[in-house]
């Protein structure tokens, strides 16, 4: 695969991570550069790791991934999105949210990188070497996640709770989109 193909694949896979990073950037107060780096490392790392796992697992997990991955992603994103909405409506009146604990980052990273697992499986079926695509996918996701978190922080303080509700709705919407595509509704 060419660099351009791998780069475009990385962009496509990074869109969910970008949206989630942007949502996270709107809610975390006080926001630090280290928060954006945490998001970028988790999302970039998982987007790079999941294709490797898919490639190694190959056809052994293809049935599971195709049957259950959209449901898992939907469940995780709906839960986290619902939690964000709840916290916006009933949480700390100062608007300070620490949604970047490691368990939350892990769940978000898994939810946004399940599609990368399927890409790895397809690479295995096609006999495509994995190293270059994985490096590019991870780097693109790292940069997009970092930028998304910073952008979310920059615009988030203008709207406070409304942006957190919007972020929660975006996560739920991503989950619904993943599920709808799996069910051939769209």
Swiss-Prot record:
Location in or out of the cell: Cell membrane
Lineage top rank: taxon: Archaea
Keyword hit for Lipid metabolism: no
Cellular component GO terms, alphabetical: plasma membrane
General function of this protein: Probably functions as a manganese efflux pump.
Family: Belongs to the MntP (TC 9.B.29) family.
Designated name of the protein: Putative manganese efflux pump MntP
Lineage, opening ranks: Archaea, Methanobacteriati, Methanobacteriota, Stenosarchaea group, Methanomicrobia
Membrane topology: Multi-pass membrane protein
UniProt xrefs under Pfam families: Mntp
Gene: mntP
Membrane spanning stretches: 1-21, 41-61, 62-82, 105-127, 139-159, 163-183
Molecular function GO terms recorded: manganese ion transmembrane transporter activity
Entry keywords, A to Z: Cell membrane, Ion transport, Manganese, Membrane, Transmembrane, Transmembrane helix, Transport
Species this protein is from: Methanosarcina mazei (strain ATCC BAA-159 / DSM 3647 / Goe1 / Go1 / JCM 11833 / OCM 88) (Methanosarcina frisia)
């Amino acid at each position: 695969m060419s660099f351009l193909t791998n780069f475009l694949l990385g962009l496509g896979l990074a869109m969910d991570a970008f949206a989630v990073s942007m949502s996270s950037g709107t809610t975390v107060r006080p926001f630090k550069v280290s928060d954006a780096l945490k998001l970028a490392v988790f999302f970039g790392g998982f987007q790079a790791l999941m294709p490797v796992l898919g490639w190694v697992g190959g056809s052994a997990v293809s049935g599971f991934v195709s049957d259950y991955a959209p449901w898992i992603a939907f469940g995780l994103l709906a839960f986290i999105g619902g939690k964000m909405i709840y916290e916006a409506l009933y949480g700390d009146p100062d608007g300070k949210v620490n949604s970047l604990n490691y368990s939350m980052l892990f769940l978000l990273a898994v939810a946004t990188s399940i599609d990368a697992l399927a890409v790895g499986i397809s690479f295995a079926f096609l006999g495509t070497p994995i190293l270059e695509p994985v490096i590019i996918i991870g780097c693109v996701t790292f940069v997009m996640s970092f930028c998304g978190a910073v952008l979310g922080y920059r615009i988030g303080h203008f709207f406070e709770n409304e942006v957190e509700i919007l972020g929660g709705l975006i996560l739920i919407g991503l989950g619904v989109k993943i599920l709808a595509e799996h069910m051939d509704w769209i």
